[in-house]
Amino acid sequence: TYYGKKITLKNPSRKGYTFAGWYTDAKFKKKIKTIESSAKCDYTLYAKWTKVNVAKVSITSAKNSKSKQILLKYKKISGIKGYEISYSTDKKFKKAVTRKNTTKTSYTISKLKKGKTYYVRIRAYKVDSTGKKVYGKYTSVKKVKVSK
């Protein structure tokens, strides 16, 4: 119980969800951020949560564009925090190299070996209210031969 003090409501955290605000009604119509110091009644507060859903990325092209490089292009997904790109010479990705935190819709993988075939896949991610990344599904695997 707090009387005479303004209370600023803090955001809670929940794995796999984003916090959408505090409400004074169960139907989430009356949003509240603070309880004023003049308030002289009890409040029942309702936390509104939104499940984090991440759409699947679509690769538009994957090709050996320059010497020992693969240029990847993929469609932009709105509302995401970034993309994670994995590539490997093994189609099961047992020894995959992963590049995280790219936000662009194209990416150049460099320092590859000429004559090798590489397998590439991408997935998008968002961040939940705990600060953890929530990943979408990987794209279908693209196969690219490095001949340049």
Regions found by a protein language model. Name each.
Residues 1-51:
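Secondary-structure capping and domain/repeat boundary segments
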Residues 22-25, 85-90, 123-125:
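Predominantly extracellular/luminal cell-surface or secreted proteins
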Residues 40-42, 80, 115-117:
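Extracellular Ig-like/FN3 beta-sandwich strand-entry sites
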Residues 79-99:
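Extracellular low-complexity, O-glycosylation-prone stalks/linkers
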Residues 103-107:
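Short S/T/G- and acidic-enriched coil/turn segments that sit immediately N-terminal to beta-strands
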Residues 109-131:
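Beta-strand-rich modules
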